[in-house]
């Protein structure tokens, strides 16, 4: 008798055919990778096909693969990853799509298929700079409207570019260049044989 994952894998291969770039299993979960050009149609099929019935998008996030595999990775930099749930069939699926252009990462919006994607896509736009084409209200959701850059990108500085503080003379919040100085972290060296009761 086939397991639930084997049944789901067979159903996905039958419904999607050549639109499957890869379909892998790890840690009891399936990950489906599709091309950006097929993304919207695949999502509709995942929701509407009676043998799949993924009624809910429960999460969507951006991923920056710039430093993945310590530089050994040589593929597209940005991806949108969705977690889908079929209540009807009691199974889950991870759906990944890579943005074809690293300079301006654009993928289709899933808001018209799963309305729950709305704020998730805004978050991925805000933090990674992923543009979701067709999104009804794609604007920042976590950072300030005047924020420069996308803070979850691997090339964004840890300390950021600007900081804000309250200026009592101007009686308002002002932005200024970051004043945090880089710290040099020196490891603690224990020089005594019985320091703190430790035996060496």
From Swiss-Prot:
<keyword id="KW-0830">Ubiquinone</keyword>
<comment type="function">
    <text>NDH-1 shuttles electrons from NADH, via FMN and iron-sulfur (Fe-S) centers, to quinones in the respiratory chain. The immediate electron acceptor for the enzyme in this species is believed to be ubiquinone. Couples the redox reaction to proton translocation (for every two electrons transferred, four hydrogen ions are translocated across the cytoplasmic membrane), and thus conserves the redox energy in a proton gradient.</text>
</comment>
<dbReference type="InterPro" id="IPR037232">
    <property type="entry name" value="NADH_quin_OxRdtase_su_C/D-like"/>
</dbReference>
<keyword id="KW-0997">Cell inner membrane</keyword>
<keyword id="KW-1278">Translocase</keyword>
<dbReference type="GO" id="GO:0008137">
    <property type="term" value="F:NADH dehydrogenase (ubiquinone) activity"/>
</dbReference>
<keyword id="KW-0472">Membrane</keyword>
<dbReference type="GO" id="GO:0005886">
    <property type="term" value="C:plasma membrane"/>
</dbReference>
<dbReference type="GO" id="GO:0048038">
    <property type="term" value="F:quinone binding"/>
</dbReference>
<dbReference type="InterPro" id="IPR010218">
    <property type="entry name" value="NADH_DH_suC"/>
</dbReference>
<protein>
    <recommendedName>
        <fullName>NADH-quinone oxidoreductase subunit C</fullName>
        <ecNumber>7.1.1.-</ecNumber>
    </recommendedName>
</protein>
<keyword id="KW-0813">Transport</keyword>
<keyword id="KW-1003">Cell membrane</keyword>
<keyword id="KW-0874">Quinone</keyword>
<dbReference type="Pfam" id="PF00329">
    <property type="entry name" value="Complex1_30kDa"/>
</dbReference>
<comment type="similarity">
    <text>Belongs to the complex I 30 kDa subunit family.</text>
</comment>
<dbReference type="GO" id="GO:0050136">
    <property type="term" value="F:NADH:ubiquinone reductase (non-electrogenic) activity"/>
</dbReference>
<comment type="subunit">
    <text>NDH-1 is composed of 14 different subunits. Subunits NuoB, C, D, E, F, and G constitute the peripheral sector of the complex.</text>
</comment>
<dbReference type="InterPro" id="IPR020396">
    <property type="entry name" value="NADH_UbQ_OxRdtase_CS"/>
</dbReference>
<dbReference type="InterPro" id="IPR001268">
    <property type="entry name" value="NADH_UbQ_OxRdtase_30kDa_su"/>
</dbReference>
<keyword id="KW-0520">NAD</keyword>
């Amino acid at each position: 008798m086939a397991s639930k994952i084997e049944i789901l894998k067979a159903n996905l291969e039958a419904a999607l055919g050549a639109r499957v770039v890869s379909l892998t299993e790890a840690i009891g979960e399936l990950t489906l990778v599709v091309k950006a050009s097929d993304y919207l149609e695949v999502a509709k099929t995942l929701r509407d096909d009676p043998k799949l019935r993924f009624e809910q998008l429960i999460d969507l996030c951006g991923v920056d693969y710039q430093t993945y595999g310590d530089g050994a990775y040589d593929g597209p930099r940005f991806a949108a990853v969705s977690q889908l749930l079929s209540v009807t069939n009691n199974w889950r699926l991870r759906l990944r799509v890579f943005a074809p252009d690293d300079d301006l990462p654009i993928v289709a919006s899933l808001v018209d298929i799963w309305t729950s994607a709305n704020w998730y896509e805004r978050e991925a736009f805000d933090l990674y700079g992923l543009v979701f084409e067709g999104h009804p209200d794609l604007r920042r959701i976590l950072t300030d409207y005047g924020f420069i850059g996308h803070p979850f990108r691997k090339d964004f500085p840890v300390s950021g570019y600007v900081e804000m503080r309250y200026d009592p003379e101007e009686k308002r919040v002002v932005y200024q260049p970051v004043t945090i100085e880089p710290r040099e972290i020196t490891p603690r060296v224990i020089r005594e044989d019985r320091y703190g009761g430790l035996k060496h």
